[in-house]
């Protein structure tokens, strides 16, 4: 699983904060033994399971899973699945699966069979960085094998081609190329002191601002291709500058402009792509709110975001969530979930649960 340091730095140079309280000097043998004892005999000690898996990095968890098999000849996911149930079981399985494979499996399920879960495709791919997309594409091949699909022509991109249509498909295919411009982390760190103009070509920014206006507001109909080209290829810093200059020049935010010129899944995907570039933690905070607001909770999305972001930027996401809602993510989780499932989610966001 490759991870770029650029994922933890914002367009203005701020460093995003995680929530996972990782125990750095863990002994994977001891952790495996504790998990085995927690499931041994009659009943299961869920708190001991949470005490281990709620405080280990994704890398540590995979090592623990391997060590469990080496010590006991059993698969840890299989054992936990037989001892737990419901959302708690699903969350444990997510924690013991490589993050990229977890996302790849979600995409496969979103497109298999009759009907398509467009919201999952949008949530996973429109928020992902170049390296995350490349890792998901690789993991998707492993997921296909897990489901008994050996056709070498089947890829994530080919499934998207078959399942989606129109400008929404074009946007997703463009994102899958993972060609967004990036700058070295060391230069990105200096943006807070030197300003965004130090890392972007302002002449190109002005050209892009005019192109986006001409592709939407200034014409009858919308030139989706021109919009897609800019939003999926320019760096997050460049897009930040575009948004600032667009509003200054035309008196309307880029988000509002694109929302007025697009619709449906294409609009949702385009706006999430843009919002992720402008403020990644805010984009995820909005997704978490959407997952919990209203009747019922979208637990799969809630779990997937918390598992995938707790080591990267979930602390910053929590700050944005509370800023926009006036109440904390912890409060919402306590209200919307229950039992051991709630305890494990709270552990992952760095809150007290015992």
From Swiss-Prot:
SUPFAM superfamilies reported for this sequence: Annexin (SSF47874)
Species of origin: Schistosoma japonicum (Blood fluke)
Binding residue positions for Ca(2+) 6: 296, 336
Statement: the UniProt record of this protein carries the keyword ATP-binding: no
Residues where Ca(2+) 4 binds: 118, 265
Entry binding sites for Ca(2+) 3: 111, 113, 115, 163
Name by which UniProt lists this protein: Annexin A13
Quaternary structure annotation from Swiss-Prot or TrEMBL: Homodimer.
SMART domains given in the database record: ANX (SM00335)
Binding-site positions, Ca(2+) 2: 44, 46
One GO molecular-function entry: identical protein binding
């Amino acid at each position: 699983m490759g991870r770029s340091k650029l994922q933890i730095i914002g367009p203005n140079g701020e460093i995003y904060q995680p929530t996972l309280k990782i125990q750095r000097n863990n002994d994977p043998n001891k952790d495996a033994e504790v998990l085995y004892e927690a499931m041994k005999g009659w009943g299961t000690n869920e708190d001991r399971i949470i005490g281990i898996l709620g405080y280990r990095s994704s890398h540590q968890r995979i090592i623990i899973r391997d060590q469990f098999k080496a010590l006991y000849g059993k698969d840890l996911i299989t054992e936990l699945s037989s001892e737990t149930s419901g959302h708690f079981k699903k969350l444990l399985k997510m924690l013991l699966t490589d993050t990229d494979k977890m996302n790849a499996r979600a995409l496969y399920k979103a497109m298999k069979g009759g009907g398509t879960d467009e919201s999952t495709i949008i949530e996973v791919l429109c928020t992902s960085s170049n390296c995350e997309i490349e890792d998901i594409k690789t993991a998707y091949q492993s997921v296909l094998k897990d489901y008994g699909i050996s056709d070498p022509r089947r890829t994530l991109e080919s499934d998207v081609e078959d399942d989606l249509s129109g400008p929404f498909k074009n946007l997703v295919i463009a994102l899958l190329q993972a060609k967004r411009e990036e700058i070295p982390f060391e230069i990105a760190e200096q943006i807070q002191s030197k300003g965004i103009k130090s890392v972007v070509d302002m002449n190109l920014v002005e050209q892009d601002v005019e192109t986006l206006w001409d592709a939407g507001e200034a014409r009858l109909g919308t030139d989706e291709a021109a919009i897609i080209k800019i939003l999926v290829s320019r760096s997050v810093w460049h897009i930040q500058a575009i948004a600032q200059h667009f509003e200054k020049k035309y008196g309307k935010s880029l988000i509002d402009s694109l929302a007025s010129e697009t619709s449906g899944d294409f609009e949702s995907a385009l706006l999430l792509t843009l919002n992720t570039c402008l403020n990644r933690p805010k984009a995820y905070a909005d997704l978490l709110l959407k997952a919990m607001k209203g009747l019922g909770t979208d637990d799969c999305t809630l779990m997937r975001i918390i598992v995938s972001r707790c080591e990267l930027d979930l602390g910053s996401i929590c700050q944005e969530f509370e800023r926009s809602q006036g109440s904390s993510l912890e409060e919402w989780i306590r209200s919307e979930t229950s039992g051991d499932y709630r305890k494990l989610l709270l552990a992952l966001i760095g809150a007290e649960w015992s």
